[in-house]
C-alpha cells in the first residue's frame, strides 16, 4: 500500500520537461503541453523503503551552490544535526540531462534513508549557475528551501582555478598558469568560465524568477570559514530546525588552517582537497579582478538587500 501511495505522489511531483533557456512562468504553464509519466516502484524491489521504517524522501532542502563556495563544509556541518539526512554525493539531477531524463523515481533512489521527522538535504553546487535548474526545482517543489553559500568572487575564482589545477596534476596533465587563463591581449578574459560563476547577480536573477528571496538563505562563506557556528545557527533557524548544533561541535585545526568537526567525541576534518593554498597572483591582476566584480557585486547587494565584505 505504501508503494502504491508513493507512486501516486511521484505522479503528481514528476518534473516537467523544459527548454534549456526557460521562459518566465505564467498562468497555466504547468498544464499546457506537458509530458508526464507514471513512476511505479515494483513491490518486490523494496525501493524507497527499509524494514526499519525509514524511507527515501525527495529533498526538502537543496544546497544549490556556489562551486568553491564551501558547499561541502556546509553540508558536513549541517549533517551534525540529528534531524538532517544528507545525500553523500553531488547528484546533478537537475543540470545533467542523462539524470533528469530518468525522472523523480531515479532521483529518489539517490537520497539517503531517513525517518519521517528528518529533513533530506542534497547539494550540487553547479545548480546555481545552470540556467535551466531553477524552473526544474520549482516544478518539483515550489515551496522548497534553498541554501546558497557565497564567498568573495575574486577568491572564489582563485579556488576554482586551484581545484582544476590539482585535478590536472593528479592525472599528470599540464595546465596553464592562472595568468594565461585570466588575461587575453592585456585584458581580463571574460570568457573564462570561472569568472562567469562569480557573477552572482546574473545567476541570482534567474532564481528569483521562480522563487521568492525568502526561500533562499544566503550563507556568508567568508564568515563561515572564519567562524562557522553563527552561520550554522542562522541555517538552523531558516530550516526551522531545533537548535541542536553548538559551538563545541567545531574546533580550529592549526595544522590544516580551518575548522574541523567534533561529533559524539569523535573529531574529523574535511578531505585534504579542501582548503588548498591558492597560487601566488600578481597584485595588479588581483586589482583587475576586484575592479571587474565591483559593479556586479553592488547590483547583487541591492538585489538581496544585504552587503558582504568583499573586495
UniProtKB/Swiss-Prot annotation:
Residues that span the membrane, as ranges: none
Primary residence: Golgi
Position of the signal peptide: 1-20
An MF annotation (GO) of this entry: [heparan sulfate]-glucosamine 3-sulfotransferase activity
Sugar attachment sites: 52, 196, 246, 253
SUPFAM superfamilies assigned to the protein according to its UniProt record, in alphabetical order: P-loop containing nucleoside triphosphate hydrolases (SSF52540)
Cystine pairings recorded for this chain: 260-269
Superkingdom to which the source organism belongs: Eukaryota
Catalytic activity: alpha-D-glucosaminyl-[heparan sulfate](n) + 3'-phosphoadenylyl sulfate = 3-sulfo-alpha-D-glucosaminyl-[heparan sulfate](n) + adenosine 3',5'-bisphosphate + H(+)
Location(s) in or outside the cell: Golgi apparatus lumen
Pfam family, one: Sulfotransfer_1
Binding site for 3'-phosphoadenylyl sulfate: 68-72, 151, 159, 259, 274-278
EC code: 2.8.2.23
A GO term from the CC aspect: Golgi apparatus
UniProt entry keywords in alphabetical sequence: Disulfide bond, Glycoprotein, Golgi apparatus, Signal, Transferase
BP-aspect Gene Ontology terms: glycosaminoglycan biosynthetic process; heparan sulfate proteoglycan biosynthetic process
Its job: Sulfotransferase that utilizes 3'-phospho-5'-adenylyl sulfate (PAPS) to catalyze the transfer of a sulfo group to position 3 of glucosamine residues in heparan. Catalyzes the rate limiting step in the biosynthesis of heparan sulfate (HSact). This modification is a crucial step in the biosynthesis of anticoagulant heparan sulfate as it completes the structure of the antithrombin pentasaccharide binding site.
UniProt family annotation: Belongs to the sulfotransferase 1 family.
Protein name from the UniProt record: Heparan sulfate glucosamine 3-O-sulfotransferase 1
Amino acid at each position: 500500500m505504501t508503494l502504491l501511495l508513493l507512486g501516486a505522489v511521484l505522479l503528481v511531483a514528476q518534473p516537467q520537461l523544459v527548454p534549456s533557456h526557460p521562459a518566465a512562468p505564467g498562468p497555466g504553464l504547468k498544464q499546457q503541453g506537458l509530458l508526464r509519466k507514471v513512476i511505479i516502484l515494483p513491490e518486490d524491489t523494496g525501493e524507497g523503503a527499509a524494514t526499519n521504517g525509514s524511507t527515501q524522501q525527495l529533498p526538502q532542502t537543496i544546497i544549490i551552490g556556489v562551486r568553491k563556495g564551501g558547499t561541502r563544509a556546509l553540508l558536513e556541518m549541517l549533517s551534525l544535526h540529528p534531524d538532517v539526512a544528507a545525500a553523500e554525493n553531488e547528484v546533478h539531477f537537475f543540470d545533467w540531462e542523462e539524470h533528469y531524463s530518468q525522472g523523480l523515481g531515479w532521483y529518489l533512489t539517490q537520497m539517503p534513508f531517513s525517518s519521517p521527522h528528518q529533513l533530506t538535504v542534497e547539494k550540487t553546487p553547479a545548480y546555481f549557475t545552470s540556467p535551466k535548474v531553477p524552473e526544474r526545482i520549482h516544478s518539483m517543489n515550489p515551496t522548497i528551501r534553498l541554501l546558497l553559500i557565497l564567498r568573495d568572487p575574486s577568491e572564489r575564482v582563485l579556488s576554482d582555478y586551484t581545484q582544476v589545477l590539482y585535478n590536472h596534476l593528479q592525472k599528470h596533465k599540464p595546465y596553464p598558469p592562472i595568468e594565461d587563463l585570466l588575461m587575453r591581449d592585456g585584458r581580463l578574459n571574460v570568457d573564462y568560465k570561472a569568472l562567469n560563476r562569480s557573477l552572482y547577480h546574473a545567476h541570482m536573477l534567474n532564481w528569483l524568477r521562480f522563487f521568492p528571496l525568502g526561500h533562499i538563505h544566503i550563507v556568508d562563506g567568508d564568515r563561515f570559514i572564519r567562524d562557522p557556528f553563527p552561520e550554522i545557527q542562522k541555517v538552523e533557524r531558516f530550516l526551522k530546525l531545533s537548535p541542536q548544533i553548538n559551538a563545541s561541535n567545531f574546533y580550529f585545526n592549526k595544522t590544516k588552517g580551518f575548522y574541523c568537526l567534533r561529533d559524539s567525541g569523535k573529531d574529523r576534518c574535511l578531505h585534504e582537497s579542501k582548503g588548498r593554498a591558492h597560487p601566488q597572483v600578481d597584485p595588479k591582476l588581483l586589482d583587475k579582478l576586484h575592479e571587474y566584480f565591483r559593479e556586479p557585486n553592488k547590483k547583487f547587494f541591492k538585489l538581496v538587500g544585504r552587503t558582504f565584505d568583499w573586495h
